[in-house]
Amino acid sequence: MNTGISHGGTETRSKTEVKTRISLPTDPLTEKIIACSMEVHRRVGPGLLESIYESEMAIELEFAGIKFQKQVLIPIPYRGRLVGEHRLDLIVENKIVVELKSVERFDPVFEAQILTYLKLTNLKVGLLINFNSRRLKDGIRRFLL
């Protein structure tokens, strides 16, 4: 599997290979989502609940004319049987999974969570955005499958 994780100028293609880039290539939709999150953070800053940031992101995405779904239920199959479901924060334009956080620091389980969401949705791009960051750009990670 070719998993790409970007954070702080690095992009990981696998667990053993790390490539550092000054500027990671992003698509226009990803840039628009990040711009919306920056606007939310600029207006309200860190320290709110994740659910509040989700509502504010929905407003910004609407203002930007970007289609999205909130709180999307994703079935979890096992051997052909449904064993449960996950609830995604946002799916944008049926292309990008956006998982919002308001936490002190990123935990490795968040990376596993978004990678699982990408696999379950068959989508290739995910954004993990932690609004509880002093500088939001330090709280954004991009994932590629």
Where are the language model's segments positioned?
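A short, surface-exposed helix-loop junction/capping segment
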Residues: 33-42
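Short, low-complexity, charge-dense intrinsically disordered segments
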Residues: 1-21
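Nucleic-acid nuclease catalytic cores
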Residues: 101-145
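Nuclease catalytic cores
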Residues: 26-31, 46-50, 54, 58
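A short acidic/basic microdomain associated with nuclease active sites
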Residues: 62-77
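Basic/aromatic recognition patch in beta-strand/loop cores that engages polyanionic ligands
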Residues: 77-78, 83-88
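Conserved catalytic cores of phosphodiester-cleaving nucleases, focusing on short active-site segments
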Residues: 45, 68, 88-106, 117
